[in-house]
Amino acid sequence: MSKFEDFRNQYNSFLYKDYSVEYIESAYRIVYHFEIPGLCEFQSKWEFPAKERVDETILKALAFHLGMAETISYWKCACPKQLKILCGTLSAEQKKWWKKLYYNGLGEFMYRNGIVVSKEDLVTIECEDKACAPLHDTQSYDGCLVSVGGGKDSVVSLEV
């Protein structure tokens, strides 16, 4: 049995437990709470300068989804079969999008570690919170948004 399978059997789930957002002296601080049951509980913190306050509904939605992006890095510790979201919800379409991001975004990780798994079997995403209404942005935007994390892929993305 591979390490991948061993870890998945030993640590079946990754919990996105909670997050908090607070405004402190012209900055927003976001604290995330994660857990891999049987392995560890931990926090991740972000702080963003803020020239002005942001609508709380929008801020919470942004913070929640930033936390979803954070789960990908930490999920790699044990590659659990389930991602359980205890502090928010995703629509079926959003779950499909996040599963695709996990699978495609972890391509190099899986290749380097000899992990062979289908997109469907990599991770299931479960939400325990009730569904909430999606946010609708009425503003129009021009240009492209490129995520730059500092790795080789970021340079390639910018060149394309």
Language-model features, listed with the residues they occupy:
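RNA-binding accessory domains that recognize and position tRNA/RNA substrates
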Residues: 1-143, 155, 160
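Short, glycine-rich nucleotide/cofactor-binding loops
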Residues: 145-152
